[in-house]
């Protein structure tokens, strides 16, 4: 009886840990900027004043200055 209780506690702990890690990984934002020869794509970024200043400097390879 004690062994099955211990297994249940371990299983419950594993599930709670998994759900906590899943929540933490989904709540963190990851900023991705993809620049190709034809366009650029911005995904998942916080648009702060500094980031907007950076984004204004982005140029694709085929664009004219």
Swiss-Prot record:
Pfam short name (any one): TGBp3
One term under GO cellular component: membrane
Organism: Carnation latent virus
Name the UniProt record assigns to this protein: Movement protein TGBp3
UniProt xrefs under InterPro entries: TGBp3
Intracellular or extracellular location(s): Host endoplasmic reticulum membrane
Keywords per UniProt: Host endoplasmic reticulum, Host membrane, Membrane, Transmembrane, Transmembrane helix, Transport, Viral movement protein
Top-level lineage group: Viruses
Residues exposed to the Cytoplasmic side: 25-65
């Amino acid at each position: 009886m004690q062994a099955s209780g211990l297994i249940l506690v371990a299983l419950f702990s594993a599930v709670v840990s998994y759900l906590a890690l899943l929540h933490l990984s989904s709540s963190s934002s990851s900023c991705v900027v993809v620049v190709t020869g034809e366009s650029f794509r911005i995904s998942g970024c916080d648009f702060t004043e500094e980031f907007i200043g950076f984004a204004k400097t982005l140029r694709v390879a085929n664009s004219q200055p």
